[in-house]
């Protein structure tokens, strides 16, 4: 058996990644793609390895021969403009007719386990296929009950709902010499004579299936890692997937600050979610209107403020809608100066917007980071602050001050001419009924009050980037509306606000389910040896690590070994102890997290 490597079948170079070299010369863990592939193949003592394509001037022959391979290596160059997989196969036809062959694209990186299974697979022609992932560009396959390929869909199929439940080719194949000579080659030659269209290897297989009722056996990707590198983004993702440096993997993944759909095999306990909302019906309504929303401009601030006012029951002049709460935090914080009170640990986006000289910090030192309105008043009453900022429930502790106590704080700040900014991004999750301060009567009574709310966090739609700020200080609200862009939210976010009211009952049901799951999750965490659970009223739980467990070590182990993101709190809390903040997801995900923590901390299966 031999291995045929199709060198740079796409014929592209990765701009800004490696300007002088093709994809196969990119380095991963210190070695190039082609060197990695050749070393993997060399382990199996093939009769020969044939590299097909490329230009002799690129030096791939000299580079490959310098590796001291045990397996003989041959080269077939292609100096013509044609460089499709089909043309490269045709260039190697004499080799392919001589013996059975593995066929590989040179832009692939994969685990050796996948190569081993392909070599041992049975069939005249075998294709490695994988469950669809949104980065895959191979052909979609149609399978019979024996998992044989009986057809190929177009490479750029537009039915992505079907794609999610489908399989695609990977660029790894095994051909018998007889099949290639008697079946594939005649159709390949005929196709190349009659068509100038660049096509993939699957094109001829599809013709053979239709013309000769041929079957293609399959080898499934299981837990194997693999990636096809076609551009700078692929190179970045593959670096993360295959890096041997655990610290580098952690830094790259956490440093992206989102976009984790690129890593579908990972579970995110870093960012905060609403596990039981939005409902399928709401999502389907968004999908049904996708095309209209994609091609239509959103409304301006006036219309969107009206939608937000309708949804939250306040006057239009008292509310501004933002591209996430972060946009509104930046805007409102630019309006305040002077001594500003913060209760810490807290959400750092607020204090980061002011100078250190303006900070008046109240560090909470109680065992569970609990505090109430009286604690706040007693601490700040002689500090001469002009602004006070409070996240309620607090992030990361989950501490909550009830509505009655908040009224006491409202009165104290008003009487002392202190601006009070309350972040209620997590208030919907508390056990208290009707806890919010977003009520027109409250706003009218307290002109010093500004309430921020992240719709992304509360309603489980972070991709829409939505937030609101309400206040009866209409001058500040009017200024903020001019400060942000007139089209600061997109059509999808606007449409969500337009239909949200129809699903309010569903939202309340989802919150009830969530509160039950929060209780269950906290109880399960208490059973994990080495964790101390801090009671929370939010959609996250803060835990202290005991017995000398290092938070950064645990974060890396959970990421690398268990494919779970978790958040450490070392930069927020300065008491020398180790803490985590864990999102609360649905019961299935929470069970997976608990099991993973037990495995990592105590080697429990």
Task: Give residue spans per PLM region.
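Conserved PLP-binding catalytic core of the aspartate aminotransferase-like
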Residues: 515, 528-562
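Active-site phosphate-binding strand-loop segment of PLP-dependent enzymes
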Residues: 369-433
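Conserved core of the sugar-phosphate nucleotidyltransferase
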Residues: 111-195
